[in-house]
Design a protein with these regions (language model features):
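GIY-YIG nuclease catalytic motif and its immediate N-terminal context
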Residues: 1-99, 118-144, 148-150
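Low-complexity intrinsically disordered segments
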Residues: 101-105
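Short, conserved catalytic or adaptor-binding loops enriched in Gly and charged residues
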Residues: 107-116
Length: 150
């Protein structure tokens, strides 16, 4: 059941169930993923992954959950919003002031935890099909995407 996905997007592909991004068991295949805030929050991001040296969607999600994607795609979108949250920044500052600063990847992981993202995905034949599906989703949905304009 996908109460937050429009019928138009549902008709484009076979979407998985929603699961928390952190700890998600994602396939090693190309495809498109949707991210939303919380268990039933609004969809905020659509992304895609090609083959990624045989890692596909799983490789993309692992990059985000490792904290190593602070400057690309969903990782950057989450980090930008966490940095705009004064309470989140104060927590990081308190860590620094107490002599326990985190590395950049730690900040990335903390931002991802703060965002409480849940994801679902659709498998595609290859990276090009994923790119096309991602564009279709972006054109159908009129939401306040976290995606940067392309």
């Amino acid at each position: 059941m996908h109460p937050v996905i429009s019928q138009g997007v549902l008709a484009l592909a076979a979407w998985s169930e929603w699961v928390p991004l952190i700890g998600a068991e994602v396939p090693r295949l190309p495809g498109v993923y949707l991210a939303r805030r919380g268990q039933s929050g609004p969809i905020v991001y659509v992304g895609m992954s090609g083959e990624r040296q045989g890692e596909g969607l799983r490789g993309r999600m692992r990059r985000y959950t490792s904290g190593k994607a602070l400057a690309s795609g969903l990782g950057e979108a989450v980090f930008d919003r966490a940095l705009a949250d004064l309470d989140w920044v104060r927590e990081r500052l308190a860590e620094v002031e107490s002599g326990q600063p985190m590395r950049a990847t730690g900040w990335g992981k903390a931002a991802l935890t703060w965002a409480d993202l849940h994801v679902c995905w659709a498998i595609t034949a290859d990276g090009e099909a994923a790119r096309v599906l991602e564009e279709q989703v972006l054109s159908l949905e009129s939401v306040d995407w976290w995606n940067r304009a392309r």
